[in-house]
Amino acid sequence: MVRTRRIWVTAAAVLALVGGVSGTAAHARPVPAAAESGGKLPPGWRIDEGRSAPQLVWRSARQVPMGDARVEFRADGRLLGVPKPERDGHSFRLGLEAARTGELTDLQVWSGGRRLDTRSAATEAPAAAAGPPAPLPAGPVDPGKPGHYRTTTGEYRLKSVRLPGFSVPVEMSAVVVAPTGVTGPRPLALFLHGRHATCYTPHGDDGQASGAWPCPAGTLPIPSHRGYLRDQRLLASQGYVTVSISANGINGQDWQAEDGGAQARSSLIRLHLGHWADWAQNPRQAPPIVREAPRADLSRVLLIGHSRGGEGVNRAALDSLYPPPAAQDGYHGKVSWHISGTVLIGPTVFGQNPVPDVPSLTVLPGCDGDVSDLQGEMYVDGTRAVSAGKALHSAVYVIGANHNFFNTEWTPGQAQAPAEDDFYDDPDRRDPVCSQGTATRLTADQEHRAGSTYIAAAARLFVAGDDKVRPLLDGSGRRAPSADPARVLSHAVGANRGAGFLPDGKVTVSGGRLCAAADPDPAAACLGEGAEGGSPHFAQWETARESGRNAVALRWTSVGATTRVKVARPVSLKGAEALALRVFVPPNTKGTRLDVAVTDTHGRRATLGRVRVDGLPGSERTASYWARELRVPLSAARRAGVDLSSVKSLEMTGRSSSGKAWLMDAWGWRPGTAAVRAAVLPRVDVGRLRVDEGDSGVRTYHVPVRVSGRGSGQIRLYVVDPATGTAKDRLVTVRPGGRAVDVPVEVRGNTRYGADLSYDVLVKAVHGAVVGSYRGGLTVHDDDPAPEVTVTPLADRVTEGSALKWRISLSKAADTDIGALFVPVPPGGGAPELSTKDVDPQWLADASGAAPDPERPLSKVDGLGLWLDIPAGRTSLDVSVPTVVDRVGEPAESVGFRQTGDDGTPLPDGLLLNGTVLDAS
């Protein structure tokens, strides 16, 4: 039997229908019923009866700015779904037919690792944070210095395009900044902004911005694509042709895309690149600004994406190497370009499937108030062991930077439209790291200058191939003076790193703990309970528990405690200069010291050296548990005769009196960047099949999973139980034409009304494969008509002190709870109305949270909404509402409740429930 979730039904809530019946019938809807303590929804939550299904609605007292991180509804730690935002910026709706069945307890709203539906009580001042670290030594080159070319700027606008899954065409507009006085073709840098409000009212009050598309009359598009002009001018002065493209049409519609719009953004990028490739061959067909610019060299392309734009450029790089399914793609031309690298600024990574063989730089803003879990770290961590590991994947952590100020059109005082600091500053509880004016927080200008410098660094390394800039990006501990006073730290994987110790693989740990990056059990999780803030390395994915994402947790209480990591297969460090470890310690801590040693398969051991690591400045609102790259030379091992071609274990010994640390990985390191060639890999895409339940019989359907490309590889397949929301996973070897990824689903037909049901499937690349569309499944539509609801009065004209009573009946039983919402309306004809002092005060409090005083008609009581709920399998329900004797002589009083629509307003043709209460005297 298929059931929807039960959201709230207590005795008081169920007994919330009042009055008689108009004699009409209405179609009922499935409504979930009970769950929070005492049967009440938490403040801000409600159920709205939709036209096809009920909706779980959360309304924020403060406007939630349109941002890049997804707003997610969770219950008891599991993901329910991604709600649709309302245009008012306050309300979010999730169709309950799409959410998991089972009890809804502990309802919460999350976005980018930050909880939105509650705030920490300001009972005590936050602990002091560490100050900014000392400046690093300057690197051998400074990529932030402008070049010697003059620049020219212009725009182009092409015909809008239709993208799969989006009902409204998307604009093809861009701003170009190019060098002048240049001979020969020049590399191309393409920028894509993130998810921001799309339209604004000129000269309006702050906050008059929306996510509508197309923009309504009287409003203008927000020019988010013009927010990187400073970055474009710097690159253009250094000889790059730059273009920044607009994606408002995607931002206004991506709530309906299962992947958050990643595939649509990839299609848009490649549509622009396709035009640039054509214009390079046929300059006369190009827009004027493109004709004025040097010819673009499409064999040297750098993609720069901010926030969801970062996920878009990652997908575009993937799709350029491994073509996506044609039905889901908006670009069907040739790939006449080569992506040399990507820059991802505060990016989302909902699928956690980065492209492994394209070099990348991920910018992590330490005070990001939007994608606040800094999930973009997965563009580094998620590439390990997937392919050959030759591409450099770097992350730079910018202390004190927020999310928005990398884009001037998202920066107050610089933007045309309303803009704000995304790191919300609570005046009653200022953050010691990220509140404006603290020693660590950057100004908008300082932040943007740092961003420009590191974008230019990536261009110089990935496109121009200048290895002198690498120490700024690969954990070598060098800085670019142009980014001062920003403190920018880096670590990396790939490039000339060799084999290493990877906790995700087959390892055993003694003296420490092999911990899970994502696990609801605090004893298994790496951070567990008590951590102040979060870790980008442990950003949560779609499932509460994941397999194969691990780290090594160290904790010691005396000098000399040792943690040993032993690998199943010996590691070769031959040819490496140093062992590079990525280690983090708790924020704001100083002077953690560790001795590092290795042992070979013959038992020869050598202590390589001692490292010291300090924590980043952090607070409970930051993701500051981020790994620093620490290097120890291998010279001591060579002197000790250790066979570096066959190392079996790594040891870390605490030399502080006590401490905690986490090891992400360790690699053989030598300088330089290797030549990168994309491997031939199979690509996996999960689709979604939608079927009708049918009236009888059992049908077996298979979740559509497409494997394309060549070769074979491994993925991890997660199948989510629709009843519990928990996921089971298994490793699967995939190859084109194979049937290893087979998820059968049995659908049993019947003629009873029920809820739609989704069987979700998720995939992640593990080794030798890439993943495009990471989520899909089977959605079963219940195709049976809803039963009719009628109301029979049992006592609809009573003396005060008695209860009004009715029987709610269905024309036939359903396989789901059936409910409807009613709101009070004034009686017709000006009749006296039942007031707050005419009903039982406890019933009033349970039904609405209101008190009787001041006395007012029930139709004036905020939040008074009356639910009926008939449990699955039953056909009737008796309900009542208690009245009280008020000892005040008065005429007969009436009350009326009208059935509501999606928005909670009464339906003109909905059921009308009337009742009359007579004076007892």
Predicted regions and their residues:
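Secretory targeting and sorting signals
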Residues: 1-28
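Alpha/beta-hydrolase-fold serine-hydrolase catalytic core, especially in secreted/extracellular enzymes
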Residues: 29-50, 65-67, 72-79, 85-88, ...
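Short boundary segments that mark the start of a structured unit
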Residues: 30, 676-921
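Short conserved active-site loop signatures built around small residues
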Residues: 32-191, 198, 208
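Extracellular ligand-binding interfaces
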Residues: 74, 549-646, 653-663, 668-675
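Short, surface-exposed "cap/lid" segments of acyl-processing enzymes
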Residues: 180-240
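Alpha/beta-hydrolase active-site loop
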Residues: 226-231, 258-298, 303, 317, ...
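Active-site-adjacent alpha-helix of alpha/beta-hydrolase-fold enzymes
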Residues: 358-435
